[in-house]
C-alpha cells in the first residue's frame, strides 16, 4: 500500500441533465496488482471536493503487464442525485441501497405453471379470495 498511486482524469464532461461530471480515469500503480474501487472513490472525492457516496467508478481494465488501469468515473452533485440516477446494482455495491431478494428462476416458473392450471370459475374465486385476504 506504500507504493505511490497516480490518478489522472481525462475527457471530463459536465452533464447537467444527470447532475454529474463524467470522465475517463487513468490509474498508474507500478509494483502493485491493482487499486481498489473504494480507494479510488475516496481519492477522487478528495480531489474534486465531493462526498465519497456521490462518486461512482466502474469499468476498469488493467493493461497487459500491469501498472496501469483505465476506467470510467462519475461524480454526482449530491448523494440524492447519485441515488436517483445510478443503477440499483451499483448502489447496492456502494452500500447506498439494499439488494432486493427475489424467488429463484425455477420457483417463478413453477408458480407460473401452477397458476396456469386453474382457470374459469375457479380462477375467479381464487382472485376474490386473494383480494379478501389482502384487505
Swiss-Prot record:
Known role: Component of the ribosome, a large ribonucleoprotein complex responsible for the synthesis of proteins in the cell. The small ribosomal subunit (SSU) binds messenger RNAs (mRNAs) and translates the encoded message by selecting cognate aminoacyl-transfer RNA (tRNA) molecules. The large subunit (LSU) contains the ribosomal catalytic site termed the peptidyl transferase center (PTC), which catalyzes the formation of peptide bonds, thereby polymerizing the amino acids delivered by tRNAs into a polypeptide chain.
Subunit structure: Component of the small ribosomal subunit. Mature ribosomes consist of a small (40S) and a large (60S) subunit. The 40S subunit contains about 32 different proteins and 1 molecule of RNA (18S). The 60S subunit contains 45 different proteins and 3 molecules of RNA (25S, 5.8S and 5S).
UniProt record similarity statement: Belongs to the eukaryotic ribosomal protein eS24 family.
Biased composition (Basic residues): 105-115, 124-135
One GO term (biological process): translation
Compartment(s): Cytoplasm
Any one GO cellular component localisation term in the record: cytoplasm
GO molecular function, one term: structural constituent of ribosome
Coiled-coil features, chain-numbered ranges: none
Keyword set, alphabetical order: Cytoplasm, Ribonucleoprotein, Ribosomal protein
Protein known as: Small ribosomal subunit protein eS24
Source organism (scientific name): Candida albicans (strain SC5314 / ATCC MYA-2876)
Keyword Ribonucleoprotein belongs to the record: yes
A Pfam family annotated for this UniProt entry: Ribosomal_S24e
Segments of this protein annotated with the region Disordered: 102-135
Transmembrane annotation, as ranges: none
Amino acid at each position: 500500500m506504500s507504493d505511490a498511486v497516480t490518478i489522472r482524469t481525462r475527457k471530463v464532461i459536465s452533464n447537467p441533465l444527470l447532475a454529474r461530471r463524467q470522465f475517463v480515469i487513468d490509474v498508474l500503480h507500478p509494483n502493485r496488482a491493482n487499486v481498489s474501487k473504494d480507494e479510488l472513490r475516496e481519492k477522487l472525492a478528495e480531489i474534486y471536493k465531493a462526498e465519497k457516496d456521490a462518486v461512482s467508478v466502474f469499468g476498469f481494465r488493467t493493461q497487459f503487464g500491469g501498472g496501469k488501469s483505465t476506467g470510467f468515473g462519475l461524480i454526482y452533485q449530491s448523494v440524492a442525485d447519485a441515488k436517483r440516477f445510478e443503477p440499483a446494482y451499483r448502489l447496492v455495491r456502494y452500500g447506498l441501497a439494499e439488494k432486493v431478494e427475489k424467488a429463484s428462476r425455477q420457483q417463478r416458473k413453477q408458480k407460473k405453471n401452477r397458476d396456469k392450471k386453474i382457470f374459469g370459475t375457479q380462477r375467479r374465486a381464487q382472485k376474490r379470495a386473494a383480494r379478501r385476504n389482502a384487505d
